[in-house]
Design a protein with these regions (language model features):
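Ligand-binding pockets and gating/stacking loops
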Residues: 2-535
């Protein structure tokens, strides 16, 4: 037992009157209640959104894709010849819609193909480049926002948690976006008196062949200060998934053991009821026991969850890379395709099974040490082109086109209620580099957190914009001169889910960058986020 000093005893005694008065009040709920509620006035019409997030693993340069400048010398930042000379796989089954052969050579021949998106915040024209051609169609492009980001973390191991959570390593509230979303929707269920839902609201889908697997697994399921029931379910895509399914059947457990555990839980729950709360529905006072109680309830429901997961698309096919500087094309297990199909399946299920948030890691077809976009010294054009094309091609085949309805639309993403978020941990040098210095002998790019891009498509976004700007200066001076932080972006994405980003478990208003941190209060901060990222 810890003994109080006289000073501590007096301090505690000064608080006792308030505490006693509180305990004498009628019983109140210690549950999550309406956690995450957005104040009125932030949205004219609150969005009813779900999020599919894709993390491009390894750090991807935006210059051939999301931030393509059409001016000579700026198009691909040193890789015009390699991009123009790429061989594109002619097989429609492998690389649907890819160019039929090498792209047009750079000037004096016709320029590399691209599509205007919008002017950035410095008034410069930004195009979607050849590697992002799957985003060119009007029903996609007109609902696309490119956000220029910047931070100062060079290692993957530090940058990935920062970008995925919006907080740096060491912060006790560092949590997956899915944790906040799951806590919010479980709070709404509880407020409505609905039974505990078997299926999670938030998932992470992590290919087994992705590099840094343990780091990704822990980050995608990071709980921070949220309730234990808010933890996203992270599933590995690959052979381990079938092992997980078999474990959900709880082999070896007996009904009598379950009954005993259920009885013991009920007894302990009764001991923890609030003063005067006799109704069975009254929540327990202990947050830790409450988390345990919900976990045990989910454990009992595991076999029914196994039945649901057995319907999840699980087929992993061997695919071929779409682009190659030198033939033959790379081949490999297309776990990204499998993960994306599973994600869309989870997001399009009817209630009460449909997910609200699914995060997918893009493990690529053309991989280097399991990090598909980590193109140090070699293969920038091949690996970035092949991997991004594979991801965007698979994704866009599962997005509805309002002008061309199909019988399969019920199982496709509807951009009116789905926000697609494409992120990466940092960018890559805006020049051919060796050891982060310009080098004409290199055919790759090194880490560059000074300027990179995230993309959001659909949801509350109705017009194309480029937020931020990357300088046109050469080499080491090509940094983001107007930029946002991963914290800004994560707060905005919670807002798109109609979740208060400034709940204590989420972000502090003052931790955001200047355009938002200076807001007079939380409501004004949310309005500023909405106006910048979604209006």
């Amino acid at each position: 037992m810890r003994h109080l000093t006289r000073r501590q005893l007096l301090a505690h005694g000064a608080q006792f009157g308030c505490t006693a008065a509180t305990l004498a009040m009628p019983a109140m709920s210690f549950g999550v209640g309406e956690w995450g509620e957005i104040p009125s006035g932030v949205w004219d019409t609150p969005p009813n959104t779900r999020i599919l997030e894709i993390h491009l693993l390894g750090g991807m340069a935006p210059f051939e894709s999301f931030y393509f400048r059409p001016a000579s010398g700026l198009r691909t930042r040193g890789f015009d010849s390699e991009v123009a000379a790429l061989n594109w796989n002619p097989s429609p089954a492998v690389c649907s819609g890819s160019p039929p052969g090498p792209l047009p050579a750079p000037p004096p021949s016709p320029p590399i193909a691209s599509q205007f998106l919008a002017n950035d915040e410095n008034g410069k024209a930004v195009h979607l480049g050849p590697f992002a051609a799957k985003l060119w169609p009007a029903h996609i492009r007109n609902r696309t926002r490119v956000v220029v980001l910047r931070h100062d973390l060079m290692p993957h191991e530090a940058a990935i948690p920062y970008v995925m959570t919006g907080l740096r390593i060491g912060r006790p509230t560092q949590a997956s976006l899915g944790a906040a979303i799951q806590q919010r929707f479980r709070a709404l269920d509880e407020s409505a008196g609905l039974p505990i839902r078997t299926a999670p609201y938030s998932y992470g889908l992590l290919p087994q062949d992705a590099g840094l697997n343990s780091l990704l697994f822990s980050t995608m399921g990071q709980l921070g200060a949220h309730d234990g029931s808010a933890k996203p379910l992270v599933l590995r895509v690959g052979p381990l998934f079938s092992t997980f399914i078999s474990q959900l059947g709880r082999p070896g457990m007996t009904p009598s053991a379950d009954a005993l555990l259920d009885n013991l839980r009920a007894q302990y729950r009764d001991w923890l009821r609030l003063q005067g709360a006799a109704t069975p529905a009254a929540p327990a006072r202990s947050k830790a026991f409450r988390d345990y109680d919900l976990a045990a309830a989910n454990l009992f429901n595991a076999p029914s969850l196994a039945s649901f997961f057995q319907t999840l698309p699980q087929t992993i096919v061997n695919g071929a890379g779409c682009a190659a500087e030198n033939l033959p094309f790379t081949t490999g297990a297309n776990t990204t395709e499998a993960a994306l199909k599973a994600a869309v399946f989870l997001l399009t299920r009817p209630a009460p099974l449909g997910a609200r948030y699914v995060q997918v890691v893009d493990s690529g077809i053309s991989k280097f040490a399991g990090l598909p976009y980590d193109v140090h010294t070699v293969r920038n054009a091949t690996d970035t082109g092949s991997n991004l094309w594979n991801t965007l091609s698979t994704l866009m085949s599962m997005v509805r086109d309002p002008a061309n309805p199909t019988p399969q639309d019920a199982d496709k993403l509807d951009l009116s209620n789905t926000l697609i978020a494409i992120n990466t941990e940092f960018g890559r040098t805006p020049f051919k580099s060796l050891g982060n210095s310009p080098s004409a002998a290199s055919s790759g790019r090194d880490h560059w957190p000074d300027a990179f891009c995230s993309v959001m498509i659909g949801g509350p976004i109705a017009t194309p914009k480029v937020l931020g700007s990357i300088s046109d200066a050469a080499n080491l001076n090509a940094v983001a001169d107007i930029s946002y932080t991963p914290t800004d972006l994560r707060a905005a994405q919670l807002l798109a889910m109609n979740v208060d980003p400034f709940e204590a478990e989420n972000y502090q208003l003052g931790a955001l960058s200047a355009p938002f941190a200076g807001a007079a209060n939380h409501t004004a901060g949310m309005v500023a986020l909405r106006q910048k990222f979604f209006d």
